[in-house]
Design a protein with these regions (language model features):
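Aromatic (often tryptophan-rich) hydrophobic motifs at membrane interfaces
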Residues: 59-63, 68-71, 81, 92, ...
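Acyl-group handling in specialized metabolite and lipid biosynthesis
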Residues: 96-99, 147
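Active-site/acyl-donor-binding loops of N-acyltransferases
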Residues: 2-9, 58, 76, 130-156, ...
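A conserved beta-strand-loop-helix scaffold within acyl/acetyltransferase catalytic domains
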Residues: 6, 10-65, 72-82, 128-257
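Conserved acyl-donor/pantetheine-binding loop and adjacent beta-alpha core of acyl/acetyltransferases
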Residues: 75-95
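Short loop/turn motifs at secondary-structure junctions
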Residues: 55, 120-122, 276
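Short intrinsically disordered coil segments
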Residues: 89, 159-168, 321-328
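Non-catalytic accessory segments adjacent to catalytic cores
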Residues: 103-145
């Protein structure tokens, strides 16, 4: 049943994502909107709710005739360590307000702020989308996006990679690596969990990865690099309107020497092209990090991501950034944890990061 949120002329409500017809209608509208992302889809909100036990509040604005005028997928994030926040889109690198006109943008922004107050979430964070207006802080310096077109064929793709990185990819060809695509979720999770532990950050719950694969169906898959039958690197990717999003990728201890990550991303470019994709979205990275430098080495030009936050006057907005000096001790300690301990504790912490 659809619950009214506020009495406003534009007709704002919280969508019933349990209704398949409602999901299909919203998904079609997002797909048709020029600024839509996979993180605006009902499938993403549902997967996050199921995989991380964080409640979804998917705002939809409708005109008097019932036509959709805008959406704002919000996730209610609660964490005993990091506090409460309302985030769009939870666990996504994109999201924010998607609307047809400025008036609807303003209505959705006001509704998000009111929803945050009602849910006792002192911080509301919008990751991209239309500018919500006065009262919101804008951050265009923390995160960078890396997107470029895919080449017409495999040889052209290899030549599109700058010389130094291209040499690394070529070296990987001689390391007896094999590539498989499909749904080896167990191997992927094990490799991803090891890689984020090595970076000093907690791993997301296994249930989140399973929920995303289930919700996106054929629009998501796992590509794994093996060496003599053993998985050494793996990535879970989303496919949306001709773009591949390698979203969660990582490798084990053997990956560096085998250049498995180099092999993995080149193989994903080839795989995505075979699926009909024309663009490769390498995701976001924090400015000034090794991850950002790695993507630039592949020939991707960084573009700043614009995020918006709002908190009550005099209250600091929630900030969860492992590069913040106040987390440096925790990051160093996490890197030293045995993998079994990191995998046991990590999901409990990470499901509250959002």
């Amino acid at each position: 049943m659809n619950a009214p949120l506020l009495t406003r002329p534009v007709g704002l409500r919280i969508a019933d994502l349990g209704d398949a017809i409602e999901r299909a209608r919203l998904g079609a509208w997002v797909h048709a909107h020029a600024e839509g992302t996979p993180f605006h889809l009902p499938a993403w909100s549902m997967a996050v709710a199921r995989g991380c036990r964080q409640k979804s509040h998917y705002l939809v604005a409708e005109r008097g005739n019932g036509d959709i005028a805008g959406v704002l997928p919000l996730t209610e994030i609660h964490s005993p360590l990091f506090g409460r926040a309302l985030v769009s889109a939870g666990f996504g690198v994109g999201g924010g307000i998607l609307a047809d006109n400025p008036a609807t943008v303003a209505e959705l922004a006001a509704a998000a702020w009111a929803c945050g107050a009602r849910l006792s979430c002192p911080t509301v964070e919008l990751r991209g989308g239309a500018h919500p207006g006065a009262g919101w802080q804008v951050d265009e310096t923390t995160y960078l996006s890396f997107v470029r077109a895919l080449a017409a064929d495999d040889e052209a793709e290899l030549l599109a990679i700058p010389r130094k990185q291209r040499a690394e990819v070529r070296r990987s060809f001689g390391n007896a690596l094999t590539i498989e695509t499909g749904g080896d979720a167990a191997t992927h999770y094990a490799l991803y969990a090891e890689s984020v532990r090595n970076l000093g950050t907690p791993v997301f719950p296994r249930a989140l990865f399973a929920a995303v694969l289930d919700a996106f169906g054929d629009a998501a898959d796992v590509l794994t690099v093996r060496h003599r039958g053993v998985g050494v690197a793996s990535v879970l990717s989303l496919y949306w309107r001709g773009t591949v999003y390698p979203y969660w990728g990582g490798g084990g201890d053997a990956a560096r020497a085998l250049r498995a990550n180099d092999a993995m991303y080149f193989a994903l470019m080839r795989h995505a092209h075979a699926r009909g994709c024309t663009r490769f979205d390498f995701g976001r990275s924090k400015a000034g990090t090794g991850a950002a430098a790695f993507k630039k080495n592949w020939g991707f030009e960084p573009e700043p991501l614009r995020y918006f936050t709002r908190a009550p006057e005099g209250v600091a907005a929630r900030k969860v950034n492992p590069l913040d000096p106040k987390y440096s001790l925790q990051v160093r300690a996490w890197k030293r944890l045995p993998l079994w301990a990191a995998n046991r504790l990590g999901p409990w912490i990470a499901q509250g990061l959002g």
